[in-house]
């Protein structure tokens, strides 16, 4: 359990998630380190040799490894609607933003992501 300060200065407790994320190439590989306290087991496509891979290859890898794809790319959104899960997809809808913005978004929606991960019906979650 982590204790961090919320925006209002109040103490907020965050429990690490068992949810494992696969960060797509349009997100910084640095996010893996930045989010390791709340999303341990997170990896980036570069870490597993999938940099510049076809969407189908990333999709298949995530499904086989039990990972949730996190991307700013709408192609995964479309695949999610067509094929369902696994894998689940989190679509970051922040446009042109910093790595810190993406990190803050994933931290702010930690509880939503855990609920999404545990939802047997949910395949797709849009954030931002």
Label for each model-derived stretch:
Residues 1-19:
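Intrinsically disordered, low-complexity and often Lys/Arg-enriched segments
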Residues 19-30:
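N-terminal beta1-alpha1 ligand-phosphate binding loop
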Residues 22, 49-57, 97-101:
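Residues at secondary-structure transition points
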Residues 39-48:
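Short, basic, glycine/proline-bearing loop/turn elements
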Residues 55, 63-80:
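Acidic, metal-binding active-site segment of PIN/NYN-like and related structure-specific nucleases
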Residues 79-88:
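Ligand-binding "clamshell"
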Residues 87-128:
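C-terminal structural segments of small proteins and small subunits
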């Amino acid at each position: 359990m982590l204790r961090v300060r919320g925006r209002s200065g109040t103490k907020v407790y965050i429990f690490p998630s068992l949810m494992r994320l696969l960060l797509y190439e349009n997100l910084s590989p640095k996010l893996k380190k930045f989010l390791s306290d709340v999303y341990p087991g997170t990896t980036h496509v570069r870490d597993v040799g999938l940099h510049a891979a076809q969407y189908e290859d990333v999709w298949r890898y995530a499904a086989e490894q039990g990972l949730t794809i996190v991307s700013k790319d709408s192609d995964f959104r479309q695949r999610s609607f067509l094929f369902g899960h696994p894998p689940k997809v989190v679509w970051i809808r922040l446009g042109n933003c910093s790595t810190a913005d993406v990190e803050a978004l994933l931290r702010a929606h930690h509880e939503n992501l855990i609920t999404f991960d545990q939802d047997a019906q949910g395949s797709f979650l849009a954030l931002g």
